[in-house]
Structure formats: structure tokens, C-alpha cells
Amino acid sequence: MSQLKLEEISSVIEEKIKNFELDCDMAEVGKVVSYADGVAKVYGLNGVMSYEVLEFETGDKGVAANLEEDSVGVIVFGFGNNIKEGTSVKRTKNLMKVPVGDAVVGRVLNALGEPIDGKGEIETNEFSLIEQKAPGIMDRKSVHEPLQTGIKAIDALVPIGRGQRELIIGDKQTGKTTVAIDAIINQKGQNVICIYVAIGQKESTVAQVVRKLEEYGAMEYSVVINASASDSAAMQYLAPYSGVAMGEYFRDHARHALIVYDDLSKHAVAYREISLILRRPPGREAFPGDVFYIHSRLLERAAKLCDEKGAGSLTALPIVETQAGDVSAYIPTNIISITDGQIFLETDLFYSGIRPAINVGLSVSRVGGAAQIKATKQVSGTLRLDLAQYRELQAFTQFASDLDEASKKQLERGQRMVEVLKQAPYSPLPIEKQVVIIYAGAKGFLDSVSVKKVVDFEEQLHPFLEAKYPQVLEEIHTKKALDKDLEAMLRKVLEEFKLTYSE
């Protein structure tokens, strides 16, 4: 037997050492020191990032919210019923991500982007961080394309443009959600993906919204994210950020999206709850000092991008609930100052039968005017002023009975215009039909129609136009303006219809 040479042995050993791979998992692990109300205090995770996802040995997950000198405050996603003192916590070295893209469209998800509609898993390789930097000034373009809601009072008086943030504000039970759902239903065929984020709502209310969207075929281009009242404060806090991450995907891929946050008052309350448990110092109304920032960084992500970035857009309709009409409370004033205008809904108007209950005097769109089509501008140019004068006259007539002819005429016209702006829920109207009926009211075609019959007049006018003069609607739709010929034809059509219309 030949003896092995010493060099050969050493070279074999050397080779083995070189090729040796240590196959083991490195994990940074900490321990729970205390756990209460959905917040865990964890010791031993020194290198953790802000808002990094952490895994508990119980299977629960959470995010690092407070980075203190000797411990980390972790917001737990669920209720963490099995977490107790001594539970191990592991770093994932990942920030919070949610699935994005066309795979999420038509689905109902929770705040973590997990499906809750029983239609199986979401099959996608595309994920996005829920916290992203908003586009800078140079990446944006001013709002100039209309986003029509199908609601006459909004499209005529407080128009919304793609990339705008328009607040819907009012007391509870004034129709705020209905306005938002109408806007979603009206996006059918407009190539706009809609995202509805329900924060702290009843499960039954959200189920009703989903049912309505399915009924009107809007679920085909919509995503519903639900963090209901029965979910933890952490889930309610994260839901809008998950929603906006999904919307941003379409915005950044040269497409258009609309996101509804229903509602940000409950979002602020959830954040207050988390902050107080994390022992952050409370400020006004016990909200933490950065409550303005949580909403500003959320709403700034809605934008109209410049042509170099693909000209996509993300439009936001945040909803805020007021208490007894008090718009000067902390959260309402914060969000009014962040957004580009507000639609103010009033209880008194709602109960007097004016629905949608939009207070035209307090509602405003700061940038939407540039996005309004010319035809709407032409017919509703003086509408806001006319309605304001009508309200003034109406108040005056309560203690003065004798009015001159001009004032009487103005009062009569005002009453009819209020009727024209009434609209049933879930029945958005195409812009060309809005132009026709507002034109009819503004130019006096309804003066001889009794106030109670104005709604009926409109209901009969649209089928008449579709059957006999579809070209009028078609021309308004394509030209987006009323020229002399089109206006003359519209007058002729309205006069003809008035002859056939019987009350």
C-alpha cells in the first residue's frame, strides 16, 4: 500500500476547508418585557428599523413603532391573545409591504393586503411598501382633467379633477359614503381603478357597500380594504396606507386611480389610541403632536404626475365626520388645510329633503375649476351666486310678505334650481345630461313647471332626448362645449319637449 504524501493530505484538507459552507440561520431575537392593549415592549432588538415587521413565536406579527434606548415599542397587528412576558420576537429585516397591481382589483382585503372575501389567495409577485415618499413638485403637473362624480351639485359647483384631494365632510347620517360610492359607480368605463378603504366601520355597513358595488358592476374595477370596528387599532391605523400603496401602483404606471378613505376621523382615533398606549405625550383633544403629519403624508401621495413620469393620477376623497356640524374641531380643520377643497354635507338640508345635502356656500373646490369641461362652466357659471341670492331672499321672505316682481321671479327660479340639483342615491348622471337639465333650469325652461314636478320633468326629459335627439347628447359629449348651433338646437329640443310634457 503506497503511502500518502504529506503535501497531498494538507492540500485535501485545505480544499475541504475552502469549500466548507456553514449552513445556519442567523436571527436577531428579542424578548417581550410587557404586553397590553395591542402594544408589546420588546427588549434585545437593538438594530431594528422604524416600522420594520417583527415576528412573534406565537405566529403574530407587528411593526416597530417606538425605538427607545433600551427597548422597542411594537404595534401588534391582531389582538395577540397568546403573547405574554418572555415571548420571543424575531426581526424580519423587511418593512411593511402589500400586494399591488391588477391581481388585487375586484377583491376585498384586510389592512395587511390579505384576502377576506373567500375567493382564494392573491397570485402576484408585485409588492409595494406601504410608506412611500410623495412625488415632489417637479414630478407633478397641475390638475387639469376632470374626474366626474355623476352628481350634478358636485360636477357643476365643486368640480373635482384627477389628482385632486377633495374632502367630504359632515355629521353622521348625512350621505357622505353615498357621495363617495356614487363617484366610484360613475367611473365605469372611464379606465379609473377605485379603492375604497373602510376604517372602523361596522362589518354590516362594509358588506352593504360591497353589495352595492357588485350590483352596479363597479367591483370589476374596485378594491375594498376593510379594517372594521372589530379589528385592532393597529389594523385601522395601517389600512389607509395599504390602500394608497395600491393606488400609487396605478398612478406610477401611467394609469388613473381614485381612493376613498372612510373615514379619517376614526383613523385619527385609532392612532390616538396607539400613541397613548405607547406613552407618547398627548396634545390637543389628547391627540399626539404628529396627528397632522399622519394625514398630510397620506394625502400628499395623491397627485397628478407630469408627462415625463407617465401622466398617471391618484385622486383622493377623504371623508371626515363632524360632531354637531363643528368644522372647527381639531381633525376637521387639519384635513381641510391639507386638502384642495371640501364638500360640506348638512343635517338640516338632508332632513328637509335636499339630497345630496350639499351646502353650496361652504363647499369649495380650490383647483377643480381648471378641470371642469367648458359646457358645464357655460351653464353653471352664475349658479353658485344665484343659489346664494335665493337663500338670502328665502330668509328675508320669512318676515316680509310683500316682494317685488323681480324678487318673486328670483325666488321661483331658485326653488326650481334647488330641485334640479336633487338626485337619488346610486344614480350618477353622465355629464352631457347634467348640462341639459342645468341649462333648462338656468335659462327659464322650468319656470312654468310647478316646483314639485321638476324632478318628474327631468326623469321624462332624458328618455325623450335619447329616443328623438341622441345627437344633441353626443355633440355635448364630444365637443365638451356649447357653441351657437348646439345651443340653438338645445333650445329647440327643450321647447319641443315642453309642448309634449304634461304635468
Curated annotation (Swiss-Prot):
- Keyword annotations for this protein? ATP synthesis, ATP-binding, Cell inner membrane, Cell membrane, CF(1), Hydrogen ion transport, Ion transport, Membrane, Nucleotide-binding, Translocase, Transport
Q: Indicate the annotated site residue(s) for Required for activity.
A: S363
The UniProt entry's GO CC annotations, sorted and at most eight, read: plasma membrane; proton-transporting ATP synthase complex
Molecular function terms from GO: ADP binding; ATP binding; proton-transporting ATP synthase activity, rotational mechanism
Give the E.C. number(s).
7.1.2.2
Q: Which reaction does it catalyse?
A: ATP + H2O + 4 H(+)(in) = ADP + phosphate + 5 H(+)(out)
Q: What class of enzyme is it?
A: translocase
Q: Where in the cell is it found?
A: Cell inner membrane
Membrane topology per the entry is: Peripheral membrane protein
Pfam family name, one? ATP-synt_ab_N
Task: Tell me which residues bind ATP.
Answer: G170, D171, K172, Q173, T174, G175, K176, T177
Instruction: List, alphabetically, the PROSITE patterns matched.
Output: ATPASE_ALPHA_BETA
Major place of residence: membrane
- Subunit architecture: F-type ATPases have 2 components, CF(1) - the catalytic core - and CF(0) - the membrane proton channel. CF(1) has five subunits: alpha(3), beta(3), gamma(1), delta(1), epsilon(1). CF(0) has three main subunits: a(1), b(2) and c(9-12). The alpha and beta chains form an alternating ring which encloses part of the gamma chain. CF(1) is attached to CF(0) by a central stalk formed by the gamma and epsilon chains, while a peripheral stalk is formed by the delta and b chains.
**Its job:** Produces ATP from ADP in the presence of a proton gradient across the membrane. The alpha chain is a regulatory subunit.
Protein family: Belongs to the ATPase alpha/beta chains family.
Q: What is this protein called?
A: ATP synthase subunit alpha
User: What species was this sequence derived from?
Assistant: Helicobacter pylori (strain HPAG1)
The organism that produces this protein has a lineage beginning with: Bacteria, Pseudomonadati, Campylobacterota, Epsilonproteobacteria, Campylobacterales
Q: Gene encoding this polypeptide?
A: atpA
